[in-house]
Amino acid sequence: MISDDTDQFNPRDAKSPEAAKGKSAKRREARQMATQALYQWHMAGHALNEIEAQFRVDNDFSNVDGAYFRELLHGVATNKTEIDTALSPCLDLTIEELDPVELAVLRLSTFELLKRIDVPYRVVINEGIELAKVYGSTDGHKFVNGVLDKLAPRLREVEVKAHKR
């Protein structure tokens, strides 16, 4: 099991369904925190390290995969140009016209599709939809779903084709 004060993984726990649930629940929390932090970064323009530090101080991270939160936050910022370039052909709007919450969700999901091939594309899409339901506008989750459904085959062509067989 991943202990609360380290990010060490014990392989024995990988066999346990409870461990898998715990890991995915902690990743879901990391995605939620990262979405909020990315929104703040986009809106306020504060330094990423300051935002990360603030989130770690102001929030209970005992149920958050802290390393994944950091990877998502910094990964989106570092790869923003690549992410936006991948997203743009799947949008009916420009990046600047997007709702900031949906933009944060789409950037996070696109980062996972591009850089975290260990996370199945269907999980990425589902998590993006759930984030948009929680934080986005009334029908934001439908918009996010539509964009990610267009994006996944472009970024994960082999995986998507294999799944559709």
From Swiss-Prot:
<dbReference type="InterPro" id="IPR035926">
    <property type="entry name" value="NusB-like_sf"/>
</dbReference>
<protein>
    <recommendedName>
        <fullName>Transcription antitermination protein NusB</fullName>
    </recommendedName>
</protein>
<dbReference type="GO" id="GO:0006353">
    <property type="term" value="P:DNA-templated transcription termination"/>
</dbReference>
<dbReference type="GO" id="GO:0003723">
    <property type="term" value="F:RNA binding"/>
</dbReference>
<dbReference type="GO" id="GO:0005829">
    <property type="term" value="C:cytosol"/>
</dbReference>
<keyword id="KW-0889">Transcription antitermination</keyword>
<dbReference type="InterPro" id="IPR006027">
    <property type="entry name" value="NusB_RsmB_TIM44"/>
</dbReference>
<comment type="similarity">
    <text>Belongs to the NusB family.</text>
</comment>
<comment type="function">
    <text>Involved in transcription antitermination. Required for transcription of ribosomal RNA (rRNA) genes. Binds specifically to the boxA antiterminator sequence of the ribosomal RNA (rrn) operons.</text>
</comment>
<keyword id="KW-0805">Transcription regulation</keyword>
<dbReference type="Pfam" id="PF01029">
    <property type="entry name" value="NusB"/>
</dbReference>
<feature type="region of interest" description="Disordered">
    <location>
        <begin position="1"/>
        <end position="27"/>
    </location>
</feature>
<keyword id="KW-0804">Transcription</keyword>
<dbReference type="GO" id="GO:0031564">
    <property type="term" value="P:transcription antitermination"/>
</dbReference>
<keyword id="KW-0694">RNA-binding</keyword>
<dbReference type="InterPro" id="IPR011605">
    <property type="entry name" value="NusB_fam"/>
</dbReference>
<feature type="compositionally biased region" description="Basic and acidic residues">
    <location>
        <begin position="10"/>
        <end position="21"/>
    </location>
</feature>
